[in-house]
Amino acid sequence: MRIGFLLLLLLCIAPVSYAQTVKTGPDPSTLRDPDLERDSYHNLEVARNYFKLKKAYVASLKRCEEIIAGNPNFAKIEEVLLMAGQSSLWLSQNKGKQRPDQYVSFEGGEKRTLTSEQFRSMGIDYLKKLINDYPNGTYTKQAQEELRQLDVPKQP
């Protein structure tokens, strides 16, 4: 009788203990490759150096674009988007020590440079992406201020 009771109790408790385990792992959007994060962080440091110290906005923009394309889940992507937006806007105004025509893109095996208006719209796009994707982010207010200075209407 006791053995039967213990067996019945064991059968009742066993499913409860299996229910305690996690079926899935962490959310895939939060998983980050450590090597990719390290590489992206290095590119961010170099972009900051170009941006703040050397006023080399073409080089800074290229580094930021590399991070955005290669690691969109980067932990500091907000700062990257702000720096890319500001670099683009300042290149459209011919600010900095590098000429805007040093920014070269290849499309269909053909080199092409961007006009001031293309740099401006690219900068606005980066800043709007920052504001829309990270509305409570640490760099959102700076992005809104940049857009306000350009008289760009707010999005809903």
Predicted regions span which residues?
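Acidic, polar-rich low-complexity tracts and alpha-helical solenoid repeat scaffolds
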Residues: 2-5, 16-156
